[in-house]
């Protein structure tokens, strides 16, 4: 989740209570990974046999881009017993609700089948856009809230937020607005997750490296397999 596909293409051409599954006492961990169109041919069987149990797959970006590999990746993950979900690369300089609706229409939904993760908003900078997409901290917070509330209204779950401590500090002023309602996917490529930003008491997932042996980025769930299954089911 380092560069958007749109960025690369452009460069080449020129409040509700936290769900019950959000458990405060974490035990163990589960390996997973995230992928996008840069990894079109993942060997999901090998990844599962290698110990991975969940995967996050890029579905959409903005309101015009849908990953051409999403459907095959999602099917491959499903057929190989993964808990899986879609993520949306956010462009907070355009409508939050329009982006949420586009995400939901193109793979970002959630159901309580026990194998579907709630959708994830990928919040990070990208080339060709000003810092924080030109938004003030208050405007960025309002954008995230509008997207999250829309997702919750449509699915009954809040989406996850993927972000780094630096981005969160710079673009939201380290707001604590979402710390008790929205699961955190912490981007920190280090030997330990450290202290979560904002008001989060803990991370739910940790992107601990920008490489993974079966493709994409390494992700670790902050809990055991039973907790991951309950989290996916939403209760």
UniProtKB/Swiss-Prot annotation:
Any one Gene Ontology molecular-function term assigned to this protein's record: lysozyme activity
Domain Ch-type lysozyme: 29-235
Enzyme class label: hydrolase
Main location: secreted
Catalysed transformations (reactions): Hydrolysis of (1->4)-beta-linkages between N-acetylmuramic acid and N-acetyl-D-glucosamine residues in a peptidoglycan and between N-acetyl-D-glucosamine residues in chitodextrins
SUPFAM superfamilies linked to this entry: (Trans)glycosidases (SSF51445)
Keyword Hydrolase: yes
Signal peptide: 1-17
Keyword tags: Antimicrobial, Bacteriolytic enzyme, Disulfide bond, Glycosidase, Hydrolase, Secreted, Signal
Subcellular localization: Secreted
One Pfam family here: Glyco_hydro_25
UniProt EC number: 3.2.1.17
Family from the record: Belongs to the glycosyl hydrolase 25 family.
Protein name, entry field: N,O-diacetylmuramidase
């Amino acid at each position: 989740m380092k560069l958007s596909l749109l960025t690369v293409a452009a460069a080449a051409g020129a409040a509700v209570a936290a769900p019950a599954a959000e458990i405060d006492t974490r035990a163990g961990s589960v390996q997973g990974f995230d992928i996008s169109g840069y990894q079109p041919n993942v060997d999901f069987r090998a990844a599962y046999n290698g110990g991975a149990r969940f995967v996050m797959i890029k579905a959409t970006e903005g309101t015009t881009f849908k990953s051409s590999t999403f459907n095959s990746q999602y099917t491959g993950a499903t057929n190989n017993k993964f808990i899986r979900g879609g993520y949306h690369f956010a462009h907070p300089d355009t409508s939050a609700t329009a982006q949420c609706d586009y995400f939901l229409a193109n793979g970002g939904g959630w159901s309580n089948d026990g194998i579907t993760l709630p959708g994830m908003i990928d919040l990070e900078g990208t080339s060709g856009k000003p810092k924080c997409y030109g938004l003030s901290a208050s405007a960025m917070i309002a954008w995230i809230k509008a997207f999250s509330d829309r997702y919750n209204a449509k699915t009954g779950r809040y989406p996850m937020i993927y972000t780094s401590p630096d981005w969160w500090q710079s673009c939201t002023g380290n707001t604590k607005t979402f710390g008790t309602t929205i699961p955190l996917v912490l981007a920190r490529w280090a030997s330990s997750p450290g202290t979560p930003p904002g008001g989060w008491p803990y991370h739910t997932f940790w992107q601990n490296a920008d490489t993974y042996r079966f493709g994409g980025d390494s992700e670790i769930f902050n809990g055991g397999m039973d907790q991951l299954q309950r989290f996916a089911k939403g209760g």
